[in-house]
């Protein structure tokens, strides 16, 4: 797979995206959807992130230098991001949670739950009932 840039950091009160992207990036790192070489090269920072000694936005701005792209992800991570993030579902989930939560830690927890739910749905093979429903729907 070739390198693909998903989004670059933006600054400003209304346009800042570091919190939104940092939460997704932290979830991806914490769920081992990162490239093995990236893990080795950034072991200390990844450990800090996993121990919550570094936030997702800090990791995004310092380790990834504000560039959210495919280079640090493994194939499964890239595929998931391209469906969930580029498909717009992550932004929808993030905005739904953000509108009802003011506390940053609580927001991160709720967003993480949404990402986990989407990921489980992504990796879970469709059941026979779902396959049959899809076939019958096209008739």
Where are the predicted features?
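Amphipathic protein-protein interaction modules
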Residues: 51-121
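Short hydrophobic short-linear motifs embedded
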Residues: 131-138
């Amino acid at each position: 797979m070739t390198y693909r840039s998903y989004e670059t950091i933006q600054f400003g009160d209304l346009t800042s995206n570091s919190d939104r992207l940092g939460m997704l990036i932290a979830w991806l790192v914490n769920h081992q959807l990162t490239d093995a070489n990236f893990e080795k090269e950034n072991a200390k920072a990844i450990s800090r992130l996993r121990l919550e000694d570094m936030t997702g936005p800090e990791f995004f701005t310092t380790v990834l230098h504000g560039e959210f792209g495919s280079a640090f992800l493994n194939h499964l991570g890239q595929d998931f991001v391209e469906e969930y993030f580029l498909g717009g579902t992550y932004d929808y989930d993030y905005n739904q949670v953000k509108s009802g939560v003011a506390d940053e830690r609580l927001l991160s927890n709720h967003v993480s739950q949404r990402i986990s739910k989407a990921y489980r749905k992504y990796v879970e093979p469709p059941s026979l009932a779902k396959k049959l429903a899809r076939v019958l729907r096209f008739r």
